[in-house]
């Protein structure tokens, strides 16, 4: 969808939302909400992409309007949790055109009132507890290819919810390391979740590659938002650069780590250096802008063992075990 069409829809949304406001309790200060989306333990807010920016008050082109909520990064299909305990009401329609993400719900309670949009809740009415599963993220890439998929989070009084979401800079691995498995590879993906399937293919080891040669995927694709911090999965010696495409595109970079009984190549990242020692969990670099090269793909780090064996078991970090409130 062209950016101008999105802008027009957002303008309609703001008008429609304004008509729905009732008297709500003031938003409390000094408290924090729970994790909203699995895979985003710090409620990281969307930056800027070709459709706009996700921060509160960001400019909305066309009518001089401002963004009245914040966009919390959430991969399509991810589990969504209740940020606080309260009463559900809905459905909440954002676009009023029946598209694939035109759904949402309101939660009112605990001194707060918020609308979470572009999700499909498990129900629209009744009580819900803080941290309880609320629903699933809808397929935003189907509607806006290449956007940073996100939940639109808007206080009912249109005040700024940013301080309640407590975004924290990615300065350290989000979870303690365990010797049995590799560390967290990408900030915002604490379980090293592997890319599923999109229009470009699938991310699991051995997935077919559509190149006409019957080849299989020789690594796994660990989900990682463009620009996210990347960590060393284990301690070892760096070497590189490692080029994947050999065409100089925006993601043609990477590095190899050898040590601790492992050898792996991490591609589509820009490392802080190509040589020297690195420790498990230490900052390794940044995810490169994959959306710029493959619009609409699930952005990811290509992780490939040097001997081309399957690294999946090393990456597993107990899905579902630490994805509630942090």
From Swiss-Prot:
Induction info reads: By the Myb oncogene.
Q: Which family does it belong to?
A: Belongs to the LECT2/MIM-1 family.
Keywords (alphabetical) are: Disulfide bond, Metal-binding, Repeat, Signal, Zinc
sequence repeats: from-to residues: 28-162, 177-312
Q: One GO CC annotation, please? A: extracellular space
Q: Where in the cell is it found?
A: Cytoplasmic granule
Classify the source by domain of life: Eukaryota
Output this protein's name: Myeloid protein 1
